[in-house]
Structure formats: C-alpha cells, structure tokens
Amino acid sequence: MAKRDYYEVLGVAKNASDDEIKKAYRKLAMKHHPDRNPGNKDAEGHFKEVKEAYEMLSDSQKRAAYDQYGHAGVDPNMGGAGAQGFGGFADAFGDIFGDIFGQAAGGAARGGGGRAGPQVYRGADLRYSMEITLEQAAHGYDTQIRVPSWVSCEVCHGSGAKPGTKPETCPTCSGSGSVRMSQGFFSIQQTCPKCHGTGTYIPDPCGHCHGAGKVKETKTLEVKIPAGIDDGMRIRSAGNGEPGINGGPSGDLYVEIHIKQHSVFERDGDDLHCQMPIPFTTAALGGEIEVPTLAGRASFTVPEGTQSGKTFRLRGKGIKGLRSSIAGDLYVHVQVETPVKLTEPQRDLLKQFEKALVEGGSRHSPQSKSWFDRVKSFFD
C-alpha cells in the first residue's frame, strides 16, 4: 500500500511553518496515542503514520529531501530516515510528549513499548563555523580543522563496560527501557529509572570513560573547500559527528562557511563589484586603465567624457560558480576624483581651463545645461 503524503497525514499545507506542523502533530498525537486507545490497532497505525510524518517534516534537512524527491528521498530502505520504527519515537519527539503527558511520556517513548533489547540511537550532528577569504572561496583549497567532539572510547570500544565484561539486560525493565505506570485514568510508560531508557546497565564501568562509552577529544579533520562556494553554504562530512549510542551510527559534521569582507571587491553571486577612482583628466580625455581581478590584472578603455558613477562590465572576470566552468562578470564603478591641495600654478591652469570652457559654450557640460534648464524658473 502506497504511503500517504506527509503533509496530508498532518493536515497542513506544503508551505506550513514549523509551528503549524508542530501544532497539527500534537493534536493528532493526542487523538491517536496508544495509551488513550488501548488495543485499538487502527489508532496505533494512525499514530505511527502521524509520528513518521512529523519526524520528516520537523527536520529541515529531511523535509527538504522529501519536498524534492518525495518518499524516495527519505525511504529507510535506501538509508534514509524513519527506520527506527514505532519504538524510537521519543528521540525525535520527546519535547512534544513532554508537553502533552509530562516527563513520564518521554521515557515511555524511549523505552519503545515491548521491543526486545536496547534502543539504538544515531549520534548527534556537529556544527563548525569557518571563516575564509574571498580568494579562497573563489579558487577552493584543502585545509585542516580541529573539532572538539565526543569520540568512542578506545578502551571499551563504546560499550561503557570494563574490558572483559559487557553490559547486562536491565532487571527492572527486562531490557525494554521503560516501565508502565498509572496516573489517574492514564496508563503510561515511563523511562526506566535504573537504565534511563537504554535497556541495559553496566555493573562494571570502564575506568577510562566511566561508563559513558565515549570521551571528549579534539579531532583533526581534512576539509576540502570547493571553488565557488558562497557565504552561508555548508559542507557535510559524513560520520564525523558524535558517536551513536548502543552501536548506532555516528552523526555528521556540518562546516558552515563565512566569507570575510574584502578590501576591494563585493560579491553578488558569481559577479564581483569594485569602486575605482580615476583622475578627472582620464575621465575627460579617455584612456586605458588597469583594474585588479582575482586572477591578476586586467585593462579596459575609458572613453573620453566618462562621468562619475559610470559602470563598466568585464565579462568572465568574476567567480566561477560552484561546480560550474562559467565565471561571472566584474563590474567596475568609476568615480571621477577631484584634485585637492593644488599649487598656485595648478590653480592658475585650471582657471584658464575654466575660462576656455565658458568661452566654448555649454556643449562641454551637457548635464549642467540640462539641469540649469530645469531649475532656472526657481531663480527668476
């Protein structure tokens, strides 16, 4: 039987906000929760369906994969999310059921309701923020980063037990990780107070990790920064997050890239912009000027009579996009610079030049003539 659309299951629109999805889930979870419908297989089936839909849509990465590829993007048979089954819903939804049923419900979910053996948990993902230069972003490079993280204990190999021993099945919950308790007319499951939901306990803890199965360590990792990466993008390093629990897979490391402000260029996608001052003589007479680019120097011709603020486009002098062989453009915004701190001879030359312009009429300054024509009525 084909799976229903996750948005349809929760009764929300595809553009629903996180809060709308959460509210819809809480309402349906309350309605179909097994503790409210003992022995009702239909309610249990609806609850599993609602739980699975919320698990996918409450996680931004899983939701993006589902929006793009549908169920195939999150199919557990293809290594996607959702493979934990009914017993593991508390890991994703403990906050929800903590609100609905109180702290006891989170433990009941963690215990898994009749499963045999301890629950397996995937390790947490890690985030690492990294600042690079515009040049590094444009060309790409390989680097190393040092990331503080929990790693599996090398003495007990992550079991938490002293070498030569092993964790034992919890006698209080018989390995289920939960115990059933009654609160008023509710009969709910609660996290086992002895094993804290793992289903096992360690009679002889490892002396190195003190039973945790993991130790804090700083890892040195190789990171490849791809050419064309932009500010805010993330690089995924699979399996370099925190170790899993009870043999679960490790999480992933996400390296978030931030690009430092450049002293010359401003980036706009694959294009670059720069402000360039030019002498007023070059603007008036025209000429060839050189500009910097990320690949060296380039030159272009400024036509005579160039005005301040004029923009020139140099094709292909920007940045090649991520996984693209086509580079953006460089936009040079020229600013005509007025000379300062003139000597007397220089001032005299400019006065003579100004006199010659006046004698030549307004054709030398068309913008000034147009402006004065528009405002002359204010001076009448």
UniProtKB/Swiss-Prot annotation:
InterPro entries: DnaJ, DnaJ_C, DnaJ_domain, DnaJ_domain_CS, HSP40/DnaJ_pept-bd, HSP_DnaJ_Cys-rich_dom, HSP_DnaJ_Cys-rich_dom_sf, J_dom_sf. One of its GO terms (cellular component) is cytoplasm. Zn(2+) 1 binds at C153, C156, C206, C209. Its cofactor is Zn(2+). CDD domains: DnaJ, DnaJ_C, DnaJ_zf. Residues 5-70 form the J domain. Participates actively in the response to hyperosmotic and heat shock by preventing the aggregation of stress-denatured proteins and by disaggregating proteins, also in an autonomous, DnaK-independent fashion. Unfolded proteins bind initially to DnaJ; upon interaction with the DnaJ-bound protein, DnaK hydrolyzes its bound ATP, resulting in the formation of a stable complex. GrpE releases ADP from DnaK; ATP binding to DnaK triggers the release of the substrate protein, thus completing the reaction cycle. Homodimer. Pfam families: DnaJ, DnaJ_C, DnaJ_CXXCXGXG. The gene is dnaJ. The keyword Zinc-finger applies. A zinc finger (CR-type) spans 140-218. Zn(2+) 2 binds at C170, C173, C192, C195. GO terms for biological process: chaperone cofactor-dependent protein refolding; DNA replication; protein refolding; response to heat. The J domain is necessary and sufficient to stimulate DnaK ATPase activity. Zinc center 1 plays an important role in the autonomous, DnaK-independent chaperone activity of DnaJ. Zinc center 2 is essential for interaction with DnaK and for DnaJ activity. Belongs to the DnaJ family. Binds 2 Zn(2+) ions per monomer. Disulfide bonds: none annotated. The keyword Lyase does not apply. It is found in: Cytoplasm. CXXCXGXG motif repeats lie at residues 153-160, 170-177, 192-199, 206-213. This is Chaperone protein DnaJ.
